[in-house]
Amino acid sequence: MRQAARFAMLGALASAAMFATALAPAAQAAGFGVAKFEAGTCNGNETEVKSCEYTSPSSAFYTQAAGHPPWGLTGVEVAHTGTGSSRVPTGEPLKRLRVDVPPGLAADPQTLETCTREQFNKEPKGCPPGSEAGFVELEAVVKVLGVPVLAPPLTGKVYNLDQEAKLPLLFGIAVEGASPIVSAVHLILEGHVSYAKEPALEARGIPSGDFHEYFEINNIPPEVEVLGGVKSPLETLKSKLFFNGHAGNGNFLTLPSGCGAPSISTSYVEVESDSGEKGSTPTVPPVGIEGCSHVPFEPITEVIPGPATSEKTSDQPDGVITEVKVPQHEGAGEINTADIAEAHATFPEGLTLNPSAANGLEACSPAKIHFESSTPAECPGGSNIGKVKIETDLPPGSLAGNLYLGAPQGLPITGPPYTVYVVAESTYGVAVKVEGTIQPDPSTGRVTAYFTNTAAHPFNLPQLPFSSVVLELKTGPRAPLANPLGCGGAKTESNFIAYSGEGILKQFTPSFAFPTTGCPNPIPFALTQSATPANATAGAYSPYTFNLTRADGQQYLAQISTTLPAGLLGDIPSVTLCGEPQATTGTCTAASQIGVATVTAGAGTEPYPLSGPVYLTGPYDNAPYGLSIPVSVLAGPFNLGTVTTRATIKVNPNTARVTVATTNLPTIVGGVPVRLKTLKVEVNRPNFIFNPTNCGALATESTLTSTFGATQGLSSPFQVGACGALPFKPSFKTATSAKTSKLNGASLQVTLTQPAHEANMKSVFVELPKQLPSRLTTLQKACPEATFAANPVSCRPLGSEVGSATVVTPVLPGTLSGSAYLVSHGGESFPDLDIVLEGDGVKVILTGNTKITKGVTSSTFAAIPDVPVTSFVLNLPVGPHSALTAIGGLCLKPLQMPTTITAQSGAVVKQSTRISVSSCGVRILSHRVVGHKLIIKVRTLGAGLIKLKGTGLPTVSRRVSKSSTVTFKLSLTRGGLKALSKARRKHRKLKINVRVAFTPKQKGQFGSAAATTVTFKR
């Protein structure tokens, strides 16, 4: 099979430059060096080509870009003296010769048969006829009997020899003693590729490192036999070497595919004498290469899954095989394909970089590649991400190597574009070191590979054809790429730019499908979840761990909304909340940390682990609290910075259950799709999160959303134990005022307190005494359910607001406070008492279901959240829209409120709560004056001491053992009588303020007093 990259063999023609041209002196030349050097490609037959020189008409030259010229030749003449047959080379004899040919000028040794070096040295005529590559004509000077003699013209053949180690091109030149004077001469022409810089050569004006070919003859004999056996110095004078461009299969020689001025086809020759003296000169052909518009250019890129069965399966690591094929046109009359100057390949949609590849991954610095140097690459083993094989004009499979991940010198890889190095070496002395750029799409992760010439590497893609380049990525769970999630023939798109001359670009953009199998339809989205406390004791502080697991082949996770079990709460006041901008940048302090988040990312069985702290923040995205979860993406040689995920923390107003939700879960970082496999969040701050006090079956419930928009609901059981060990000793007190009226109704205050670390309340039932019924006119003003649901404040103008409440809870730094409303619900006989509490951005609604039976009002708060409450105070005041009214006096007898308080643990406290009535200790029922005597009737509630006094009246007291009505009869004292007499003289009446005080016998109760004014007339 024809190999594409041909090593320029025109330089082989320059081997003739070892033969000097003149025997006689030439007055114009002096010293060692080159007098004339010509190189080019010519038309014509074997006879016509012998006369092809720079002075020939332009029609004599072959100029078609990428074409196969009939002939390629070089002509070299060394410096000499004399003219005609008297020419003699000047300086010392030629020892070594080197010829450098233009980049892209190529020959294909594989198109010819080969001859072994052993056979050539023994008897060149024994080489296969198919190994003949051309012929030479030369002139040389020998000494016969000590006299310089220009030997008759010598001719010989050029044979293609077997390629050897470090020699990609090897030819034998056999001059078989056609002259009766000179014996046979056998020379070896060694060909190389200039892939490394040669500073010494460039100092002499000869370029290097641009992948042109150069050729050396190092075995020029210092002497030959003349006249059948006499040794004589050999001084070459002039030579022409002709390569048959149509030898072999007709395509032995190929011109560069780039067009331009003749200067781009410059060749160089360097000669060296026995003493080491050097001479060099360039040559520029009289005509340039043309016809680039006719050069075909049809490269193809194919991307196929790796060899393993799993590598053809969706969402699996894949040792993808990428092959760039360049069809060759090998016929003698055909124009070959253009060389590739730039290549872009966009991989199939969904075939993306795999985070799992970071496991054990290293990177190779440019210094370790040794660009522009013949030193082999010294990349660390961990940077090897694949293999490369290039099919060129070497034996099949001999140019091979590795694909390495690159990194800046001494620095981590901080983001796209990413660098790769293609390093291929051959035992035949050819090395290719190409830098590539990998640019993933930041939104989709779709990968595009770029191989271009750059300012740093102007010959990154040398002008050397090839028939095939195969890149085979590393296989296994750490493969650099992972397959698309879906099937359906995603396509590879490639774009190539040819070497086609100045200002001319030829582009070709083919697309080929990428086969992926094993795709269910539809693609499933069924993750698994677990959530457990470290300590399952009710009410205990315990770390809480939440896990999500996604199997390969599942849709990718984009959003999470997780509702914690009822009663699983955090002690927010114990944490310093992280503010802005620290929460956004993920730079909170340890005082805000409440846990750790760990993820594994990547396809396959070895996803890469990453972790970061979980910080509690202040308000975020309309939620009272939030989370900031910064994860430093340090993976192998990569440092892609810190990715901060934000989450909201909201509290359900009816259940007080906490919901944590994130809508910005990272799906692509640095152009790399995360392919999240597991997510683990551990809330492990000491004495922060504590368990419910309800031992019933609870659950952690999540709603997941995929990048495809699919949703999944998950529920993980959660249950604690030992609820019975929790104490439950709440204190429940109520109070009202005896100051009631028809206009403003009656008041009621409820105060509930509870020590810390007890079972939390679940429900409260109360039954009001008959003396405190619900107020009908207020019930009729109950707020409609829809209005309340839309905005409770809208209920105020309706007269539905009947009170206020305040709650202190240890889980919030401040207090919750708000209003109490009567709310009517469809189908219910009586409106509920709904209490709206707000504070620290949290809203909680407590619903009391109201019933009225035979004038007695009862209320049940049946669904109190499992939240610790330090104190709860409800005030239902008097007013035009009071919730309650009064029947009769509230001070006539004790008011009792049957009360049942049930704990989340199941414990029950039942009591008959006595309502404390203010403004009701003592009352003056009546009074009258008869002459100089006051008769006053007083009523008390309970046992105690009654004391009565007034100016001009005696102070009297009396103890009562129970609620009593006592009549006092008091006569004016002597002072009182004097005051009365004085008033009469002024024609006035005597008015005396009388005060009645009552001190209850029972300790802890407040005393009371009443007063009135009495009038004495005579």
Q: Language-model segments: what does each one mean?
A:
Residues 964-968:
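Short strand-edge motifs at loop-to-beta-strand transitions and within beta-strands
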Residues 973:
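Residue-level signal for threonine
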Residues 97, 343, 560, 764, ...:
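Residue-level detector of buried hydrophobic side-chain packing
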Residues 920-958, 988-1018:
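Extracellular glycosylation-rich, acidic/polar low-complexity regions of adhesion-
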Residues 1-29:
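Sec-dependent, cleavable N-terminal signal peptides
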Residues 976-979:
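Short beta-strands and strand-coil junctions in structured, solvent-facing domains, enriched
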Residues 15-17, 25-921, 1018:
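Ser/Thr/Pro/Gly-rich, low-complexity intrinsically disordered stalk/linker tracts of secreted
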